[in-house]
From Swiss-Prot:
GO terms for molecular function: 6-phosphofructokinase activity; AMP binding; ATP binding; fructose-6-phosphate binding; identical protein binding; metal ion binding; monosaccharide binding. The lineage of its organism: Bacteria, Pseudomonadati, Pseudomonadota, Gammaproteobacteria, Enterobacterales. ATP binds at residues 12, 73-74, 103-106. Its main location: cytoplasm. GO terms for cellular component: 6-phosphofructokinase complex. It comes from Edwardsiella ictaluri (strain 93-146). Pfam families: PFK (PF00365). Substrate binds at residues 126-128, 163, 170-172, 223, 244, 250-253. It catalyses: beta-D-fructose 6-phosphate + ATP = beta-D-fructose 1,6-bisphosphate + ADP + H(+). Homotetramer. Pathway: Carbohydrate degradation; glycolysis; D-glyceraldehyde 3-phosphate and glycerone phosphate from D-glucose: step 3/4. This is ATP-dependent 6-phosphofructokinase. Keywords: Allosteric enzyme, ATP-binding, Cytoplasm, Glycolysis, Kinase, Magnesium, Metal-binding, Nucleotide-binding, Transferase. The gene is pfkA.
C-alpha cells in the first residue's frame, strides 16, 4: 500500500516541470498521500536531499519556468552501488514510490529503481520532443514559441540587410522543434537530423531562391548536424550573400510555460498518481491523440520509434 511518494526532476530543465511537480503534489495530497521533493534529481536522491512538500510548497509555481526542485545530470546513477545508496535513502524517508520528470535517461533510472522494489512512473519533460510513446513532451510548446519569436526577430534584421541568417535550434537528434518552428516562422530552408544533409545541396537551393528574386532568407537547422559558423562562411563564399549564424542555446529552455504545457504537465502529474495507486511501476506517461496513455519504460526507450513528420516537411517545402 503506497502512503509516501517522492518526486524529482532530472536531466535538462524544461518549462512546465514546475506545473508537473504541482500536479503530482496536489493529486497525491488529495488521495491522502504524503509527498516528498528530491532536490537536483538522482544526485539529490543519492545524497539524501529530500524534504516533505505540502500544498503551499507548490503555490505560485505553475507559471514559473525551470524547476524549483532543481535538476542535475548524474551518469553515476548507472552504477548499482550508487542506486543502492539512493534506495537506502528512500527507505530512510519511508518512500514507497517515485515520480520522475525528465527524458530517456531519466526513464532508465526510474526503471532500475522499479526493479529494485520501488515503483516509479516517468513523465516526459524535455523541450526536444524526442521521447517515444507520446505525441508531445512537457516544455516543447513553450520552447517552440521562444524559437519562433527569435526567428521573427532575425527576419526583421535579415530583410533590412538582405542577409541570409542561419538559426541553430535545440532538439538533440530530433528535428521536431526545428521543423515546427521553421513552418511557423516561415523559414525558407530547413536542415534536420532525419534527412541527409549536404551543404552543397543547401547552397544550390539558396541559389535557386536568389534567381527567383529572394533578397534574404532564414535557414533553420537542428543542433549537432554541423558547425553553423563554418556553414555560414561556406554559404557566403558560394553565394556572395552576407550570411550570419545564430545559436539560440539555452534561452530555449527558459521562460514561463505556455498554457498547453501547463495543462499537459498538470494532467500528466495527476495521472501518475492514479497509476501508482493502481499498482503500476516502471511505466512512462504519454499523450496520444489528446488521450493520456502509459507504456513500459524499456519498451518506450528501446523499441518505440518516434515517427518523423515527413508530411510536415513536404508542406514546408511547398510553402517556401
Amino acid at each position: 500500500m503506497i502512503k509516501k511518494i517522492g518526486v524529482l526532476t532530472s536531466g535538462g530543465d524544461a518549462p512546465g516541470m514546475n506545473a508537473a511537480i504541482r500536479g503530482v503534489v496536489r493529486a497525491a495530497l488529495s488521495k491522502g498521500l504524503d509527498v516528498y521533493g528530491i532536490h537536483d534529481g538522482y544526485l539529490g536522491l543519492y545524497e539524501g536531499r529530500i524534504e516533505q512538500l505540502d500544498r503551499h510548497s507548490v503555490s505560485d509555481v505553475i507559471n514559473r519556468g525551470g524547476t524549483f526542485l532543481g535538476s542535475a545530470r548524474f551518469p553515476e546513477f548507472r552504477d548499482e552501488k550508487v542506486r543502492e545508496k539512493a534506495v537506502e535513502n528512500m527507505r530512510e524517508f519511508g518512500l514507497d514510490a517515485l515520480v520522475v520528470i525528465g527524458g530517456d535517461g531519466s526513464y532508465l533510472g526510474a526503471k532500475r529503481l522499479t526493479e529494485m522494489g520501488f515503483p516509479c512512473i516517468g513523465l516526459p519533460g524535455t523541450i526536444d520532443n524526442d521521447v517515444a510513446g507520446t505525441d508531445y513532451t512537457i516544455g516543447y510548446f513553450t520552447a517552440l514559441e521562444t524559437v519562433v519569436e527569435a526567428i521573427d526577430r532575425l527576419r526583421d534584421t535579415s530583410s533590412s540587410h538582405q542577409r541570409i541568417s542561419i538559426v541553430e535550434v535545440m532538439g538533440r537528434y530530433c528535428g521536431d522543434l526545428t521543423l515546427a518552428a521553421a513552418i511557423a516562422g516561415g523559414c525558407e530552408y530547413i536542415v534536420l537530423p532525419e534527412v541527409e544533409f549536404k551543404r552543397e545541396d543547401l547552397v544550390e537551393e539558396i541559389k535557386v531562391g536568389i534567381t527567383k528574386g529572394k533578397k534574404h532568407a532564414i535557414v533553420a537547422i537542428t543542433e549537432h548536424i554541423c558547425d553553423v559558423d563554418e556553414l555560414a562562411k561556406f554559404i557566403e563564399q558560394e553565394t556572395g550573400r552576407e550570411t550570419r549564424s545564430t545559436v539560440l542555446g539555452h534561452i530555449q529552455r527558459g521562460g514561463a510555460p505556455v498554457a498547453y504545457d501547463r495543462i499537459l504537465a498538470s494532467r500528466m502529474g495527476a495521472y501518475s498518481i492514479e497509476l501508482l495507486l493502481q499498482g503500476y511501476g516502471g511505466r512512462c506517461v504519454g499523450i496520444q491523440n489528446e488521450k493520456l496513455v502509459h507504456h513500459d519504460i524499456i519498451d518506450a526507450v528501446e523499441n518505440m520509434k518516434r515517427p518523423f513528420k515527413g508530411d510536415w516537411l513536404d508542406t514546408a517545402k511547398m510553402l517556401f
